[in-house]
């Protein structure tokens, strides 16, 4: 079976992200749309809001870090950017997470 997790490194901490069915349903409710719709907007040059990216990462952390919430993820993203990363790099993590969760083919 393929590994369905994505590693998200912040400082010296490595977080495992994974979206199972329950997390996908929660994500759709929180975003008010399917993440697939968000990905289609990317193809048209649109970008997700920072709030949407935080929501995706927070929900992606729930399987392996059940106490994670959006406020804690916002703090992690501050550290992520301070470490020299960009929100575009974060978007790559999100696309990989959505790919491994089955929203898009992994070959894309």
What does each model-found stretch correspond to?
Residues 40-56, 60:
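A short, charged
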Residues 17-19:
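Short capping micro-motif at the N-terminus of alpha-helices
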Residues 3, 22, 48, 52:
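Short, well-structured alpha-helical interface segments that form or flank functional binding sites
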Residues 21-38:
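Short, surface-exposed, low-complexity cationic segments
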Residues 1-14, 33-45, 65-108:
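Charged interaction scaffolds used for protein-protein
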